[in-house]
Amino acid sequence: MDVKSVLSNAFAMPITSPAFPMGPYRFINREFLIITYRTDPDKLRAVVPEPLEIGEPLVHYEFIRMPDSTGFGDYTESGQVIPVSYKGVAGGYTLAMYLDDHPPIAGGRELWGFPKKLANPVLAVHTDTLVGTLDYGPVRIATGTMGYKHRQLDLAQQKKRLETPNFLLKVIPHVDGTPRICELVRYYLQDIDLKGAWTGPAALELAHHALAPVAELPVLEIVEARHLLADLTLGLGEVVFDYLDQPEANAR
């Protein structure tokens, strides 16, 4: 393979059989259980990178079922998203996500900078309850429950919430272990067709784990719960802040 061929095929690894395809990345019947809770503000500030800003000390704990996604297949994801603002615009910062499918782990980390790890999340209806669980190895570290479709939510309002910007801290090391990429990335969910939105009574339990520290942001109070069903496209990202271009990087 000559240099021109390497460059023309340089999208993802392995170069002869990439772990994930080029987009667009469309999701059909993507189902969310989002439980918003109040947490310790000091612990929240310790994990949210500048220049993002936090307001109320809230966390969205999410269980997401994705049965039909372009190139990524059928999988489930779970993790924590923190409400933040950037230059006065409200959005969400993804702290960590845990999922059961390699292509979106590889693609998520390499393309956008999603902080993804391999685990075993489940989202399913059990009789009258929507139940989300997350196991890391043999250890249950998250359990979320919500009464199934107790009350409808306003679709236009919930769609507007899904359309707000999302932020990621993309970190990729150089071959010598020093940072090669250290960027704040912004992306949007696009072409959203919100098919349903509901709420109900909810509960969330988090357990401590050395390698999946979801409980480091403790649940102090449940604020709201949402069950959403949508078709949407995961848009590609843009770099809004490069940490390696800052004066602090030159002082390392």
Curated annotation (Swiss-Prot):
Species this protein is from: Paraburkholderia phytofirmans (strain DSM 17436 / LMG 22146 / PsJN)
Biological role stated in the UniProt entry: Catalyzes the conversion of acetoacetate to acetone and carbon dioxide.
Entry's family note: Belongs to the ADC family.
Protein name: Acetoacetate decarboxylase
GO terms of molecular function: acetoacetate decarboxylase activity
Active-site residue list: K116
Matches recorded under HAMAP family: ADC
Highest taxon, organism lineage: Bacteria
Source taxonomy: Bacteria, Pseudomonadati, Pseudomonadota, Betaproteobacteria, Burkholderiales
Enzyme nomenclature, EC number: 4.1.1.4
Keywords for the protein's UniProt record, in alphabetical order: Decarboxylase, Lyase, Schiff base
Known catalytic reactions: acetoacetate + H(+) = acetone + CO2
